[in-house]
């Protein structure tokens, strides 16, 4: 019985977190891009592809929109450049893992 209560509490927390995260993700520029034509959606940047020149153009994943994650790369000449790729942030990976686990348990 205790395990069921823990799983239910975890799922309620996840659902409330994801709904608040969805509201936070809808910034003004993203809202405008969502209201634009659907060609924008077809031209979004897939997961693991470079988004250095278009940091708000990442596609949506299963539950969340991918985020443009940037790192600084130092070449052998000592030059520093910023390289970015679309990926799933760690907190979104954790949420997807919990949801997947919940689906396996509750079918």
Swiss-Prot record:
Assigned keywords, A-Z: Disulfide bond, Knottin, Secreted, Signal, Toxin
Propeptide: 21-41
Tissues in which the UniProt entry reports expression: Expressed by the venom gland.
Superkingdom of the organism of origin: Eukaryota
Compartments reported by the entry: Secreted
InterPro entries, per database record: Spider_toxin_CSTX_knottin (IPR019553), Spider_toxin_CSTX_Knottin_CS (IPR011142)
Keyword Mitochondrion among UniProt keywords: no
Signal peptide as annotated in the record: 1-20
A single MF term (Gene Ontology): toxin activity
Disulfide bridge map: 44-59, 51-68, 58-86, 70-84
GO cellular component assignments: extracellular region
Zinc keyword on record: no
Family classification: Belongs to the neurotoxin 19 (CSTX) family. 04 (U1-Lctx) subfamily.
Notes concerning its domains: The presence of a 'disulfide through disulfide knot' structurally defines this protein as a knottin.
Name of this chain's protein: U1-lycotoxin-Ls1k
């Amino acid at each position: 019985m205790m395990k069921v209560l823990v799983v239910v509490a975890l799922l309620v927390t996840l659902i409330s977190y994801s709904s608040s995260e969805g509201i936070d993700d809808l910034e003004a520029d993203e809202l405008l891009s969502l209201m634009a034509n659907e060609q924008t959606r077809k031209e979004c940047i897939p997961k693991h592809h470079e988004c250095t020149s278009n940091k708000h153009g990442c596609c949506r994943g299963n539950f969340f929109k991918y985020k443009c994650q940037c790192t600084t790369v130092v070449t052998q000449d000592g030059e520093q450049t910023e390289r970015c790729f679309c990926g799933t942030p760690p907190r979104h990976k954790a949420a997807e893992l919990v949801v997947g686990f919940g689906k396996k348990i509750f079918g």
